[in-house]
From Swiss-Prot:
One of its GO terms (molecular function) is phosphocholine hydrolase activity. This is Phosphocholine hydrolase Lem3. It is found in: Secreted; Host cytoplasm. Its EC number is 3.1.3.-. It comes from Legionella pneumophila subsp. pneumophila (strain Philadelphia 1 / ATCC 33152 / DSM 7513). Keywords: Host cytoplasm, Hydrolase, Secreted, Virulence. It is an enzyme of class 3 (hydrolase). It catalyses: [Rab1 protein]-O-phosphocholine-L-serine + H2O = [Rab1 protein]-L-serine + phosphocholine + H(+). GO terms for cellular component: extracellular region; host cell cytoplasm. GO terms for biological process: regulation of GTPase activity. Its main location: secreted. Virulence effector that plays a role in hijacking the host vesicular trafficking by recruiting the small guanosine triphosphatase (GTPase) Rab1 to the cytosolic face of the Legionella-containing vacuole (LCVs). Acts as a phosphocholine hydrolase by mediating the hydrolysis of phosphocholine to Ser residues of host RAB1 (RAB1A, RAB1B or RAB1C). Dephosphocholination of target proteins restores accessibility to GTPase effector LepB. Can act on both GDP-bound and GTP-bound Rab proteins. It comes from the Bacteria. Signal peptide: none annotated.
Length: 570
């Protein structure tokens, strides 16, 4: 197996040539320009300055960044408080059979307080990494990672430590023999998980959750709150779902999905469950309709671009509105309520401004989830504070995972682990039902793209083919020959006839090289080697003798072939 060593966060990450075992986002600090100065930024420059691509493989990608942009002042060192990661799991043969995926959102911060941000990031990152590193089911994992460690109890830390919290959206999926892929999903807070089929139709949504705190305030629960509550169901959205090969799982912090068109799924006096509008969401992927096998990065990029585009447009609308209100100096005119502001704008001919303000406040015109009741005296000062807070933005992270095709993973293992060819042979025999199965799998693998670096700014992303064409062509040829031979070895024929059929096949296939034949014989060994016991000489057959004669014949054929090749070169 071709291997590379990649240094990330001072840790050695062991990788194969086409995928990485584990990725987790590292600490990111960006320059956060004030809203007033940031209005002229176009989407491309906004993303290039603030977002990063973290790539595990064609099937697992993360885009992490921030739309934070404060009202008046630049913040030189603004820490991204989200974390996301993927840990791929394998069976005893090294074949990918599942993954653990998590995305965490550090709650609070973002005000330029470096000490506070560092502590929030620490909790966010450690929560994510602990989830990935645990080897238990999701319920046990959540229980374990929310238990305070002895080191934390002894630690003398700033007062912020006591109140530092993080929300989490996470899942584990695994391929169960005979049952297919099963996924365990958990959402604690305002992350959101959406499961799509391979045609981008929404199958399931693991909703975000907000808890009512009183005084009209709704906030997300956290892992820390989950650890201390007796009624965990009140804070946790938990689902176990059957998944299909090719399904796409998108997990996002609210800095991404909150910028899209949202939908209230359910509400009680104590809790809201929130998701995205399904009809709107499926339109995001119109450009991928004809793409045969888009990468997880392509999917993450499209959603991120749409979300940040809406964020910038919303921000520009708000800034323009705020400026128009402030230019009127209403405090000098004794205008103190929103109704008075609306009346003033209409009387003075600023009808468009009045309509914009009314739509934002009373009609959820920006789809940001905050609406007011009409015909109530609403203080202008309170609304101005609200409007300015809506321009701030948020840390924004998206993780896209595709459920792998098991045959693709068998082929990947066949390429990456040559020493396991013989062990994998019966798995191919059980899985492959036709040559078309192999053709489809190799076509998908030919489309796989991987980012050479684990992490890079989104403006610098570039991708390479995960496999060389000659590698796939050679492997497909060998496995196609194996399929034809193994299905053609009729067990109803006697031992001699089966060996004769195999010998005839190998001799007539001129494309087979010496190493190919040796590999095929190794893979077929369990099917053609002599049976032990009394049946070895059944009907007068001495299978050991026939087996040795067969191998001698093959060796002579290979020797003759080598001599012919040498003569042709003279």
């Amino acid at each position: 197996m071709k291997l590379r060593y990649i240094i990330n966060e001072n840790k050695l990450v062991f990788t194969s040539c086409n995928m990485r075992d584990k990725i987790i986002t590292g600490k990111k600090i960006i320059f956060s320009q004030s809203v007033a100065k940031d209005q002229t930024k176009n989407l491309s420059s906004f993303l290039s300055e603030r977002f990063y691509s973290v790539n595990q493989s064609h099937n697992h990608s993360i885009i992490i960044g921030s739309s934070l942009s404060h009202q008046e002042n630049d913040i030189e060192h603004d820490t991204i408080l989200d974390t996301s990661g993927v840990l791929v799991t394998t069976d005893t043969n090294g074949i990918v059979n599942g993954a653990r995926v998590a995305i965490t959102d550090g709650l609070g911060g973002g005000n330029g307080d470096q000490e506070e941000d560092d502590e929030i990031y620490r909790v966010s990152h450690s929560s994510c990494e602990n989830f990935l590193n645990c080897d238990q089911n999701i319920d046990t994992t959540l229980s374990l990672i929310t238990q305070p460690k002895a080191s934390d109890k002894k630690q003398t830390a700033p007062k912020t430590l006591q109140h530092t919290e993080a929300s989490m959206a996470a899942f584990i999926y695994q391929n169960h023999p005979g049952k297919g892929y099963i996924g365990e999903f958990a959402n604690i807070g305002d992350g959101l998980i959406i499961i799509l089929d391979k045609r981008f139709k929404i199958k399931h949504m693991v909703s975000a959750c907000h808890i009512y705190r009183g005084f009209g305030t709704w906030t997300p629960p956290s892992l820390q709150a989950l650890a201390t509550t007796a009624n965990k169901d009140a804070l946790l959205v938990r689902q176990t779902l059957k998944l299909a090969e090719g399904d796409i799982i998108i997990s996002m912090t609210d800095g991404v999905w909150g910028e899209l068109k949202t939908s209230l799924i359910a509400q009680t006096n104590d809790r809201r469950d929130i998701g995205v509008d399904k009809e709107y969401f499926k339109t995001l992927f119109d450009e991928l309709t004809d793409a045969p096998y888009p990468s997880s990065f392509d999917i993450a990029r499209i959603i991120t671009q749409r979300a940040m585009s809406r964020s910038l447009e919303r921000r520009k609308t708000l800034i323009k509105l705020i400026n128009e209100i402030e230019q009127q100096h209403f405090h000098e005119k004794s205008v103190k309520t929103i109704n008075e502001v609306l009346e003033y704008f209409i009387k003075t001919g600023h009808v468009e401004t009045a309509q914009t303000l009314k739509a934002i406040l009373f009609e959820d015109g920006l789809s940001d989830g905050i609406t007011y009741f009409e015909n109530i005296e609403i203080p202008l000062e309170m609304v101005m504070h609200d409007l300015k807070s809506r321009t701030v933005g948020d840390c924004s992270t998206i993780n896209v995972t595709r459920i792998p095709y098991h045959l693709d993973e068998l082929i990947r293992g066949f390429i990456n682990y040559p020493e396991k060819h013989q062990i994998l042979a019966p798995l191919f025999k059980a899985r492959v039902k036709s040559e078309a199965d192999l053709e489809e799998a190799f076509h998908r693998l030919s489309l796989e793209m991987v980012q050479p670096e684990i992490e890079c700014p989104i403006s610098e992303t570039h991708f390479e083919r995960a496999f060389k064409k000659e590698t796939l062509d050679k492997t497909q040829a060998v496995l196609t020959h194996y399929f034809r031979i193994s299905t053609g070895l009729d067990s109803k024929k006697n031992y001699q006839e089966r060996l004769n059929d195999l010998s005839a096949y190998l001799s007539k296939e001129s494309s087979l090289e010496k190493n190919d034949i040796k590999l095929l014989l190794s893979m077929l060994d369990s099917e053609i080697k002599p049976k032990t016991g009394v049946f070895q000489t059944l009907f007068g057959e001495n299978q050991n003798k026939l087996y040795k004669a067969f191998h001698k014949k093959i060796e002579l054929q290979l020797l003759d072939s080598e001599i012919e090749n040498k003569n042709e070169l003279k």
